[in-house]
Amino acid sequence: MTGPKNLDRTSVHQALAQELADLCTSAQGPHGQAPPTINQQQITSLHHKLGVPIPAIYTAALEKGILPLRYLRNYPAISVSEQMKLATSRAVVVGAGGLGGQILITLARMGVGQLIVVDPSRFEESNLNRQALSTPLSLAMTKAHTAQSVVEDLNPAVEVTIHPVRLTAKNRMHILADAHVAADALDSIQDRLILEQGTKEAGIPLVHAAIDGFFGQLMTVYPQDPGLTRIYGSGDDLQPSSHGNLPMTALTMANLQAMEMLKVLLGRGRPIRNTMLTMELEEGLMEQFSFPQP
């Protein structure tokens, strides 16, 4: 942190606390009176005045029960203390295409403070039908770098780390270190199994999804769960289906993945665990089935 020359670190924190107390205002939420709030312009001004990083200002505000205005419509479904928990959470998204791009956007809007993006590929024109991060201007750009730029523009409180590489058995522990949850947004069965083994070794939950045409599937795998081997086995003799990748399916399943990640991070609800959720959007069908005990 680099603040004004005449202020040491302690003084900067004290000055920030006082500024936050002076700036916060009351706001009317969707269900009546909301917590005191602070807006983006005020946060940016504090950043320039005190030299405090913007993510740190968001965190300091939440610690004092002050809700950044951008999160007002998360409240009261997400409490201020839960918003603080999200701000200090670390999520890994492996794959930044049809599933991963939307997961990243949703998590950034929700306020997950640290996002790690893993994807070695570049955008192609055939991605434009469904991949939330792709535009004609992003063609040939790396998905990881594009994700970083989009997310940081969308929410400057989010810190983005990128790995424009393929996840492997050798690098997975480095990438997954200190994360709280990971998302499987891959399209290779073997890569999914490599990721799952990494999350088991790292001791964190994995939220899996896959799509094919109008069909999507979703499951959250905790380290002690049998997980994806119940679906794919070793994966050696399986070939991916080819009914296309539609935007409705990709965005639906991606947001369900983001919801599962939210459950994990906040310890809320009932994760779809040891159970597969399947959706067939054309017929409007949604089912859950449990796997038989091995």
Ranges and model annotations:
Residues 2-91:
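N-terminal charged helix/coil linker that caps or initiates catalytic domains
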Residues 149-170:
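S-adenosyl-L-methionine
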Residues 79-122:
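Glycine-rich adenosine-cofactor-binding loop
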Residues 103-104, 147, 195:
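Hydrophobic residues within alpha-helices
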Residues 59, 119-155:
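Glycine-rich phosphate-binding loop and adjoining beta1-alpha1-beta2 segment
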Residues 268-280:
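Core catalytic loop region at the nicotinamide-binding pocket of NAD(P)H-dependent oxidoreductases
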Residues 255-270:
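Oxidoreductase and adenylate-handling cofactor-binding alpha/beta cores
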Residues 2-39, 43, 167-168, 173-174, ...:
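E1/E1-like adenylate-forming module used to activate ubiquitin-like modifiers
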